[in-house]
Design a protein with these regions (language model features):
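Primarily residues marking transmembrane-helix entry/exit sites
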Residues: 13-21, 111-115, 143-146
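C-terminal transmembrane helical hairpin of 12-TM major facilitator-type secondary transporters
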Residues: 84-132
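Flexible cytoplasmic inter-helical loops of multi-pass small-molecule transporters
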Residues: 1-6
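Paired intracellular helix-loop junctions of major facilitator superfamily
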Residues: 80-81, 136-145
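Extracytoplasmic gate region of multi-pass secondary transporters
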Residues: 14-70, 124-133, 161-168
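Loop-to-transmembrane helix entry/capping segments in MFS-fold secondary transporters
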Residues: 50-54, 142-152
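Helix-to-loop junctions at the C-terminal end of transmembrane segments
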Residues: 68-84
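Alpha-helical transmembrane segments of MFS and MFS-like solute carriers/permeases
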Residues: 9, 18-27, 60, 101, ...
Length: 169
């Protein structure tokens, strides 16, 4: 087993790891904030019940987000052969593309359009999840991969879960 000090020392020499962690943390901050605020917003703005929000909006959004994670990972892997940077820029493009869909979803007066904005936004946004693990483990030695993942998740979840819902809600 690798000592924590040795693992942290290696991580400190990997700027790509820290840039990716920063990006994943910002994405988690927004994602956790949106997901915790989304149901309350739908209930208040569109006068639906929490059950209706959960079944008719949040379930399809969750499904599209999961599919988007796999689709983005697949696309980035496919493009990686010719464009090694695709593992980073494909998910980054998805994050950027999600912004207008989320803005639209939270500003439209039409519930169907709001649902579509959230579904499409979730599909393109959550592709970063596949990339964060690929990059996080790809820039360190095999002996440090588990620690790298733990550090990434600790930082992203501490700030994402800890501050995202509070700030956005």
């Amino acid at each position: 087993p690798v000592e924590l000090r040795e693992a942290i020392r290696e991580l400190m020499t990997k700027p790509a790891f820290w840039w990716m962690t920063a990006g994943a943390t910002v994405a988690a901050f927004c994602g956790y904030g949106i997901s915790s605020f989304q149901s309350i917003f739908l209930v208040r703005a569109h006068e639906i019940t929490t059950g209706e929000a959960a079944i008719w909006i949040n379930a399809p959004v969750s499904m599209s987000s999961a599919i988007g994670t796999f689709a983005t990972g697949w696309l980035a892997t496919k493009l990686y052969k010719k464009h090694p940077g695709a593992i980073a820029w494909v998910p980054a493009l998805g994050l950027a593309l999600s912004i207008p869909f989320y803005v639209f979803a939270f500003t439209t007066q039409n519930l169907l359009y709001a649902a579509l904005g959230l579904i499409i936004g979730g599909f393109v946004k959550y592709g970063y999840i596949a990339a964060q693990y690929t990059i996080g483990q790809g820039v360190v030695s095999m002996r440090v991969r588990a620690t790298a993942t733990a550090v990434l998740l600790f930082i992203a979840n501490l700030i994402g879960y800890g501050c995202g819902p509070l700030f956005i809600g």
